[in-house]
Amino acid sequence: MQPLVELIGVSKSFDGTIGLHPTDLAFQPGLTTALIGPSGCGKSTLLRLIIALLWPEKGRVLFDQKDVTEANAQEVRRRIGYLIQEGGLFPHLTARANVLLMSRHFGRDVSQMQQRLDELCALSRFPREALDRYPAELSGGQRQRVSLMRALMLAPEVLLLDEPLGALDPLVRSALQRDLKEIFGRLKQTAILVTHDMGEAAYLADEIVLMNEGRIVQRGTAADLRDRPADPFVSEFINAQRSAAF
């Protein structure tokens, strides 16, 4: 099976500081991959390269076997859903308007998207009666569910999630983790998740990519990283997470 997203020798620097060393990485359709590692290790940079919010200095980013270029970047973004930590909701728009914004942006008939909105409310467990509330009138968990619906509105082939649960309290976070896992399974969604949390990565992802200082240290299942660490950093990272949990 051909990868849906592929990076070939991709690197990126910021003001002379290397954010991502030359990297080869492929993402298979229907799988959830977690990018995990300390702050500044290149996880979010990698996501922004995939969705063409950043451009590589060297190497190629491929989507569906085609190079991502300035000429086709808008089309690539239409086929990708993007969810960030704080959601990026517009405070002056209702939940409904925030979700339907993607339809308008890409020229879809909003009236035809109402059925899709109903489906997403059920899928994300968002109460329909709250659709006409503004973000300030919603809880943190509800706001993030609105952001998730917006990311899924156009039935994206790939869903990118950049620390989507990091700002939520533990109980809300746990509930959303369960819902995300169910959504990934029901939609057979190709998803790339950025997180600091090894437990979250192990729960949600089919495979984990551990990064450090702009490089991939190890790729495998949670059991691979735990039982067969490829580098001392892998064990250090996992042990630090265990210590922080108590």
Question: Locations of the language-model features?
Answer:
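Helix-to-loop junction immediately C-terminal to a conserved catalytic motif
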Residues: I51
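Conserved ABC ATPase signature
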Residues: Y134-L138, Q142
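Conserved catalytic motifs of ABC-family nucleotide-binding domains
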Residues: A155
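Conserved ABC ATPase "signature" region
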Residues: S111-E129, E182
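ABC ATPase "signature
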Residues: R219-G220, R228
